UniProtKB/Swiss-Prot annotation:
The chain crosses the membrane at residues 23-43, 55-75, 100-120. GO terms for molecular function: antiporter activity; monoatomic cation transmembrane transporter activity. This is Putative antiporter subunit mnhE2. Keywords: Antiport, Cell membrane, Ion transport, Membrane, Transmembrane, Transmembrane helix, Transport. InterPro entries: Cation_antiport_E (IPR002758). Its main location: membrane.
Length: 160
C-alpha cells in the first residue's frame, strides 16, 4: 500500500514540476511511469515485494477463476440437460494449507460460487473441507480437487 501511495505522490509531484498552468493526464501518466521505475529500483528498502507483482497475480487469479467458472457451468448444464441418469453426487474432503480465516473464507466462497459443488462443513482443527459435488466419479473428482488446489495456490501467491 505504501508503494502505491508513493507512486501517486511521485506522479502528482511530476505534474506540479512539469505543468504549472494546468493538469495534464499525459504528464501524470509519465510521472506515474517514472514513479514505477523509482519504486522498482528502491522496493527492496520497503521490505515488501514490488506492488505490480501482486496486481499481476490478481489478474491471473481472475482469469483462472473465470475459466473455471465457465467450464464448470458448461459441465453442470451438460449434466442437467443430457446426463440426468448418470449423475453421481457425493461428498469428498479437501485439506487446505491456508491458515488465515479470511483466506479460508475466500476459498470457501470460490468453491460455493463455482457451479456443481458446495462446501458443507469446514473442520476447525484441521482446516478440512467437506464438499458436496454433483459428480464424484474419478475424473470429475480429480478435476474438482485440481481446481480447488489451483485456487488455493493463487490465494497463497496473493497473500505472500
Amino acid at each position: 500500500m505504501k508503494q502505491v501511495v508513493l507512486n501517486i505522490v511521485i506522479a502528482f509531484l511530476w505534474v506540479l514540476f512539469q505543468d504549472e498552468d494546468e493538469f495534464k493526464f499525459t504528464t501524470f501518466f509519465a510521472g506515474f511511469l517514472i514513479g514505477l521505475i523509482v519504486i522498482y529500483i528502491l522496493h527492496r528498502f520497503f521490505g515488501e515485494e514490488f506492488y505490480l507483482k501482486k496486481i499481476w497475480v490478481a489478474i491471473k487469479f481472475l482469469a483462472v477463476y473465470l475459466y473455471q467458472l465457465i467450464t464448470s457451468s458448461i459441465s453442470t448444464i451438460n449434466y442437467i440437460l443430457f446426463k440426468t441418469n448418470e449423475v453421481n453426487p457425493g461428498l469428498l474432503t479437501y485439506e487446505t494449507s491456508l491458515k488465515s480465516n479470511w483466506a479460508i473464507t475466500f476459498l470457501t466462497i470460490l468453491i460455493i460460487i463455482t457451479p456443481g459443488s458446495t462446501v458443507i462443513r469446514i473442520s476447525k482443527n484441521t482446516n478440512k473441507f467437506f464438499i458436496h459435488s454433483i459428480d464424484v466419479s474419478e475424473k470429475d473428482k480429480e478435476n474438482l480437487l485440481k481446481s480447488i488446489k489451483q485456487y488455493e495456490d493463487l490465494i497463497l501467491e496473493v497473500t505472500r
